[in-house]
């Protein structure tokens, strides 16, 4: 969907710095590092996130870690259904009230699920989401993203804000310095690219690191099987290859294959140089290798 197709209704009163702090004080909320809580307080930033997500009224958007509701309100201006998953019981309780106060005409479009995004299943959600749009808790951003892409096959896109370094890793190309496990595993589900940068001053409390936007477009026609059993086989090989990053694949995959010789045989059968290192292979190569097990 093009940016021109995204038309905000403008019914929500978005949160600014004063409103964010006032809500936190009213609810007795103190952001914790344990939950990776940094609340966005800049209206232009949340509008930019929604625009970059490319969502429209027909989408059901999954938001993880809505916090005080900054991004939630901006999403409700554009889509007719938002499912917000929040682990913090206080924030989960107050989010519907905040939306009712600041966007009364849109409050019926929000459903809140109090749960851990690392454990949530499709059956736990009141609707099947088509898009993930979230300021992910930075301490668990990659596991949450991969879990949701695996658990919710109806997600056609994901637009997430993560630590800038993590954004670079997710969108990295084979052979680059930061290419690693997150890059390969995210590439199993779809195409991944950086979608922008976000500075520190739009958050409260101000984080020590810059943030980045990452967009995942799920494959319309998957180039390989997407079932859980196949995914686990592929991910097992990825983990083994990067556990000993500086070793050749022949050596790094010896434990997985049973011996260096068997690892070499499987690598050659998959059309992969046994002396290569894991950081040089794209996701498709790992999928080919899994077929040799």
Swiss-Prot record:
Tree of life domain: Bacteria
Catalysed transformations (reactions): adenosine(1518)/adenosine(1519) in 16S rRNA + 4 S-adenosyl-L-methionine = N(6)-dimethyladenosine(1518)/N(6)-dimethyladenosine(1519) in 16S rRNA + 4 S-adenosyl-L-homocysteine + 4 H(+)
Subcellular location as annotated: Cytoplasm
Pfam family, one: RrnaAD
TM region positions: none
GO MF entries: 16S rRNA (adenine(1518)-N(6)/adenine(1519)-N(6))-dimethyltransferase activity; RNA binding
Enzyme class: transferase
Keyword Cell wall biogenesis/degradation on entry: no
Cited function: Specifically dimethylates two adjacent adenosines (A1518 and A1519) in the loop of a conserved hairpin near the 3'-end of 16S rRNA in the 30S particle. May play a critical role in biogenesis of 30S subunits.
PANTHER family assigned to the protein according to its UniProt record, in alphabetical order: DIMETHYLADENOSINE TRANSFERASE, DIMETHYLADENOSINE TRANSFERASE-RELATED
Protein name in the entry: Ribosomal RNA small subunit methyltransferase A
């Amino acid at each position: 969907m093009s940016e021109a197709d995204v038309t905000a209704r403008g019914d929500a009163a978005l949160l600014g710095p004063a409103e964010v702090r006032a809500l936190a004080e009213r609810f007795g909320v103190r952001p914790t590092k344990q939950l990776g809580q940094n609340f966005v307080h800049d209206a232009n930033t949340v509008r930019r996130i929604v625009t970059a997500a490319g969502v429209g009224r027909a989408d059901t958007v999954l938001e993880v870690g809505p916090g005080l509701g900054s991004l939630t309100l901006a999403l409700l201006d554009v889509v007719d259904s938002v499912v917000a998953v929040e682990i913090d019981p206080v924030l989960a309780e107050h989010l519907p009230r905040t939306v009712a106060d600041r966007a009364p005409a849109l409050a019926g479009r929000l459903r809140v699920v109090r749960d851990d995004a690392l454990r949530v299943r499709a059956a736990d959600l009141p609707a099947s989401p088509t898009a993930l749009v979230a300021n992910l808790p930075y301490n668990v951003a990659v596991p949450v993203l991969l879990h949701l892409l695996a658990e919710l096959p109806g997600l056609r896109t994901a637009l997430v804000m993560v630590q800038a370094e993590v954004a670079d890793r997710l969108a990295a190309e084979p052979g680059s310095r930061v290419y690693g496990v997150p890059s390969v595993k995210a590439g199993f589900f779809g195409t991944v690219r950086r979608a922008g940068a976000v500075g520190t001053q739009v958050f409260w409390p101000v984080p020590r690191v810059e943030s980045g936007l990452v967009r995942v477009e799920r494959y319309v026609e998957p180039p390989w099987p997407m079932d859980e059993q196949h995914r686990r086989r592929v991910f097992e090989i990825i983990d083994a290859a990067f556990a000993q990053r500086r070793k050749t694949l022949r050596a790094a995959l010896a434990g997985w294959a049973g011996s260096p010789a068997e690892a070499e045989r499987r690598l050659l059968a998959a059309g992969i140089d046994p002396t290569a290192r894991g950081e040089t292979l794209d996701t498709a190569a790992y999928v080919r290798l899994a077929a040799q097990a």
